[in-house]
Amino acid sequence: MRQAIMSYQNLVSEAGLTQKHLIYGDKELFQHELKTIFARNWLFLTHDSLIPSPGDYVKAKMGVDEVIVSRQNDGSVRAFLNVCRHRGKTIVDAEAGNAKGFVCGYHGWGYGSNGELQSVPFEKELYGDAIKKKCLGLKEVPRIESFHGFIYGCFDAEAPPLIDYLGDVAWYLEPTFKHSGGLELVGPPAKVVVKGNWKVFAENFVGDIYHIGWTHASILRAGQAIFAPLAGNAMLPPEGTGLQATTKYGSGIGVSLDAYSGVQSADLVPEMMAFGGAKQEKLAKEIGDVRARIYRSQVNGTVFPNNCFLTGAGVFKVFNPIDENTTEAWTYAIVEKDMPEDLKRRLADAAQRSTGPAGYWESDDNDNMVLSQNAKKYQSSNSDLIADLGFGKDVYGDECYPGVVSKSAFSETNHRGFYRAYQAHISSSNWAEFENTSRNWHTELTKTTDR
């Protein structure tokens, strides 16, 4: 066994400046991540718009576990492992639907939409009084919370409330998620399995604007809207047009200012800019010029660990781990509730064309995501990967922008924040230890010496 994974203590250096390459390909570490990352943190499940009525349900993933997310008769949302308590068979095969309950296809055990075991074939004849149905309901996800219609679940009772977990990321998201009038999620998600470690996808979304001009050069040259001047690394983004912000719990945000129409098809730009411009004027009076401008920008980001998005481009993703080298990407579209129906449809179509399974942006990115395969190689696995772009320039306590902030579009600020939190989790046995390790998180990330 290779170095017993170095006791999980030093895979990421202080301030997240370097990461051991093996974090992308080690089987033992992946199993440890399921325990310390996916069983501990808040994970995206679904959106109110996909389960609006009692009995509506969708399937979601929490790490490698599949769950049923169901709207209850009282309007609340509950989630349960999609596993029969009798012999462990998957209960629900459909991706979504409406049902009063769920019946296992193996022996016919029936559960209510509230997860309670309601019926057992030949219960009295075969079991007598031995079956304690109240004790044999589906295993429930103990914590469900919502952020402006976006529903998250968590298995850990010690985790902070969702709004605290999001931290300063919520400040950047609320102009679009709340003050715009709200969002709808367009599903079902398009799904594709990619040979890459889940973290590679998460870090790409959390703050990697640096790759756009080179990786996506051919698309940009074909006239892909706002970012076309960057094609082939022809130029840097003008100063003052972008920023990044990272948080205590690893979530991060990148803002491409005024790029509301983002990476979508050029024919959407005039209509998107007109729609967003009119709303920006209204929002400026309600939430101030700074946050109204964020609304009319493209915001890329990752809610730690694996929920990613591009607002202004209509893209919303979950990167579900399968194993240390394989990830299933789920791609939804997000649209504003008050958009004209035709614009919603076209934006959702454009989001899938660009970043769905066969998307032209997605194809470029997936070529890079397989970099994790090198983590399986003996010499490569023990090398250090660097994430020091912009280190020493980040600030905490900016007068306009919360979080640890870089005033540059090209920075690895958010990589460092993501991996600082990642290391704190994998080397901690519970939330209390994580909090103790993270008490000086912003000081660590804003050091100007000791690279």
Swiss-Prot record:
GO MF: 2 iron, 2 sulfur cluster binding; iron ion binding; naphthalene 1,2-dioxygenase activity; oxidoreductase activity, acting on paired donors, with incorporation or reduction of molecular oxygen, NAD(P)H as one donor, and incorporation of two atoms of oxygen into one donor
Keywords: 2Fe-2S, Aromatic hydrocarbons catabolism, Dioxygenase, Iron, Iron-sulfur, Metal-binding, NAD, Oxidoreductase
Binding locations of [2Fe-2S] cluster: 84, 86, 104, 107
Enzyme class per UniProt: oxidoreductase
CDD domains per record: RHO_alpha_C_NDO-like
Textual note on the cofactor: Binds 1 [2Fe-2S] cluster per subunit.
Domain Rieske: 42-126
Positions with a binding annotation for Fe cation: 211, 216, 365
UniProt entry tagged with the keyword Oxidoreductase: yes
GO biological process per UniProt: catabolic process
Catalytic activity: 2,4-dinitrotoluene + NADH + O2 = 4-methyl-5-nitrocatechol + nitrite + NAD(+)
Assigned EC number: 1.14.12.24
Cofactor(s) needed by this chain: [2Fe-2S] cluster; Fe(2+)
Protein family per UniProt: Belongs to the bacterial ring-hydroxylating dioxygenase alpha subunit family.
Purpose: Component of the 2,4-dinitrotoluene dioxygenase (DNTDO) multicomponent enzyme system which catalyzes the incorporation of both atoms of molecular oxygen into 2,4-dinitrotoluene (DNT) to form 4-methyl-5-nitrocatechol (MNC) and nitrite. The alpha subunit has a catalytic role in the holoenzyme. Also able to convert naphthalene to cis-(1R,2S)-dihydroxy-1,2-dihydronaphthalene.
Protein name: 2,4-dinitrotoluene dioxygenase system, large oxygenase component
Gene: dntAc
